[in-house]
């Protein structure tokens, strides 16, 4: 066998001392940053003559000079700064080195990359969680890689809802002093979930940030559960600590109920069929906290067959109010009692330099195991025993002088005592540690090693770095001075350089040198230390320094006081670099408890920053590794001392080229720095270098309150008058308090005053600042605790029914430093009776410091409507209390809380209206009004008023958000409202009546409505009645949506793709004959023409009418083919009155006058003409409608049909306005009190018709209107300037007769409205309905939760009712359990659930003739006695079908 010898050792033996020939080294970063200062360092050694030196950076036809100077003979070292100052699209560049003398010429040219200008854009929202209807504020700031602000232009900023619909858009947004600040308003009914803010930057990158929209109520207090993350099977017990604190820092008084369970794998094997082992206990909170020791014996931790987790569920209940907050926690169980690991290990060992490392022994939760014996093995042989210190660590060192192997293998084990365990149970384990270190190559066997403590280095201090060295003395002179050099690289570029001269006595030693640590190096830097061996080798080492994430712009904010009072004045002191521009933000801590979101922190800023760590010489597709490899060593035997040796390389050895590649540092040199490579055969291909990594570079992206002491700790800083009583009224409760941009003056400070909100909470405040020179900085968070030493809280139900008795819970908090005498009074009122249920000896009592007391009053309301209940709590010094209050603290306080309670009448509400459009034409015109009440009206529930306005559309203009008296939970109601608003806006704009105030209001409504309506859009562009059903969309609804969204583009932002996508879907619904296919569902059978064979014709007419209304070109294929379908139907004969009306309108729009006139002539013959009015009735007139006023009337079809005729008359080339006015007279009588009509369909069509009519006729009234009865007389004036003014007159007896006299010219609209309650009707039409209540847990002694089951059956003429609403009113003092209502969405018929103003709404589709049951839970939150029944209503949207029932909890059954 031929012996082998390590190649490096053989080469060293055969290497003679190299002659002193000229040497050179040029250091330059492989990626050069544009517009930033870069550095290059150059060594010239052993020059035997003077030379000229030139180093240039060549790029895109230009060049930048780095060095250009003469150099004398000898040695030369210098570093030069340079900058790429020109814009260039080219990324590839070259650095050229030229050293020219008489006899010497050194020339080398290598590639580098010029980094594309990359910036980081950050988004900050005012709060991470918003509620419906909020105004959302956000900021945008862009920084370059050096944290300098960039005055960027953002081509596009959009906001996307959870379904990726763009709901807001800003184009070409500029910054103000490098910060952009925008806002938008959410609709009151938004899609709940995560919203996305999308920023398109000038460079083409996209930045996104998120916030959440939900209906969560801000938590009253927070619960912290402290328990170990992990326990071992050997632990007999562990401690669990529960703490509950109000957001303003004070402890909660109450109790904690804790349940700890361990689940079984197979519960079926248990006799009791239980699937878990549980322990439950209750602990009382003391000072807001409670500690409990959990005994683990019951959980059998070392038993197999159970999950290795303890599930902890905790509920904290506040005393007095019963408010609960829950918390969950998981405790993991492990059989691993300890883990040995290696820490701070170098991947390479250097022979001759001691190898250092750390052993760590830790238990679960990373707890250090102290005073334990660990054994270290090297290549399988023990080298020493080590005992762990108080940190569970033990330092070790290994002498490497006699180690020659390519790798060393280390193993560390815990020297454990012997033990025995049963095989069927879990056994304790200890995990060993393993590590391998490779040899580092040096041709001269010379090494350096930087010693670095493995911790983050703090900013703004000087750090001493120690370097070990072991140098081969060959080629050195005796007692030589050796010069060590260092480079510091930050974000891919050379930032600093220096040198240290060391007097070498022994060739193994160490030295130290300082480096100033500051923000320029953050968040990490590479330190590279090297020396030049006379034998022609570079001896070097590098380490990566982790730097504190600090900023050059030092920003700090402070409140004038750490704690303050609600409603007080405070100031914020801001410090930053002079002339900085700063963004302040203060958020209620309660909002952060819901979701911390992507908070802007130093960590998130640096994490997002595109700083460079180059691994390998690849950048953006460029291979910058153009260093020519040295010739490989042929695999040829060498003869030495009588033996043949075969060269063997080692692919695992580290060398300097690895270190340089890791840093992205390029070298131009003729010195030795690579390990030799053996020429390989095909079967012995060398592997890639261990540390070369072909990634372009690493780019990091991301998003990203101390418990306070008792209030009295700082109450001394709040000055109180010693005699005056402090009285507070609290009304301002925002989630975000401070959202301001502030300039810092030339001294670097700013003071800003703010009014503290009334929320008793803790505010979390911070600021970030930008400055052209100092760059970006962000402050640490500061807190301001807001509390009153003495205040009262009141809890009561939102609404009650008259004659019910409700409990009002009043809690008084005393956070003064002493006990006080308190008095709590509920003020008397003629609107209610009040009696106290809490026993007390006198009107005043003593309340100890830090405690609270609860009182309960029973309230019996006497009047209907909103009733204000006033509670007053006062405090004063008591003789029974020691006088230990702070001298500066006043104990005289008065806190007043006014609680509003809605008192409702029994039964359900009905409405009757009587309307007239009176046009006197210079004479006097009179009308009589008489609205009669039914005999069963609820006493005291009658409300009546008369409305006078000079424009028939005036009432609708005042009710743009509520034209109909019904819930807006379906897509049909939502788009009908939007369409009506657009018609009115178009009318106001056309008649020059659109004021900025009205336009602003309408735009807000349209924007909110558009957001809502996107929730009904399917992914194919169609719209459905219910949110995102993604079933077959409704053609009628999609057509109306397309038209409305197209017309809304004139007033608000609409994403272009939204209507286009709907148009594409509509076109696909067209058949080959040009007609549009009827909908399989959501068909409104209440209207004529939407039944039978002519349904396709009516639907086609509607869609074609939409195409014409939005102005599609007549050549548009779907429009042209649709008209062909309608003409064919017309020629075949149309007998249905509704279809005739809509066809007449469409033909008039299309300019087909002959067909329009023919249809109008036919319709005129079937019209009802009476009292100067014209209208059309249904062919089959239904019985008189007795349904409640909020249920769509079956007679709405007559109104819609009449309005289509009016549209047809007005759309002809020659309009008959006299004929049209008679139709309008009848329509005026059909208007409801909100300006709409009976239902959604007739409202949209009729408002379009009325706006078209008013555009043609105008509105210029000059009227005097007298409203008189036997008892009173009132006069109103209407003129051109007041034509849109809606005037009201409350009348004492709305059901008596009134006379309306109108004098003057022009028209005025007069409407009398009567509202009243009647007992729940017993009749039904189309449905049967029953409601049952049951106990949710029959074992509860004090029942607070109940199950409510609503069962409905369709009994109408059709197979099923298409769109149905179930409205369940909550009993007084009760609220629905939201999770139980949400679960009903899994019912195939329930498409949506909603909770509004004490009502639970269920939207259903296709309710069959079989019984459908809905079961959900309700919970009593406030005690109410003599509870009145609550009504439940079911009705159909398309047809006047309905049923009623009621429920109560007086008679209940246990739920099974």
Swiss-Prot record:
InterPro entries: A-macroglobulin_rcpt-bd, A-macroglobulin_rcpt-bd_sf, A2M/Complement_sys, A2M_N_BRD, A2M_TED, Alpha-macroglob_thiol-ester_cl, Alpha-macroglobulin_TED, Ig-like_fold. It is found in: Secreted. GO terms for cellular component: extracellular space; protein-containing complex. Pfam families: A2M, A2M_BRD, A2M_recep, MG2, MG3, MG4, TED_complement. GO terms for molecular function: serine-type endopeptidase inhibitor activity. The keyword Isomerase does not apply. CDD domains: A2M_2 (cd02897). Glycans are attached at residues 48, 172, 868. Residues 1-19 form the signal peptide. Inhibits protease gelatinolytic complex activity against type 1 collagen. Belongs to the protease inhibitor I39 (alpha-2-macroglobulin) family. Homotetramer; consists of two dimer pairs that are disulfide-linked. Part of a complex composed of complement component C3, CLCA1/CLCA3, A2ML1/OH and ALB/serum albumin. This is Alpha-2-macroglobulin-like protein 1. The gene is A2ml1.
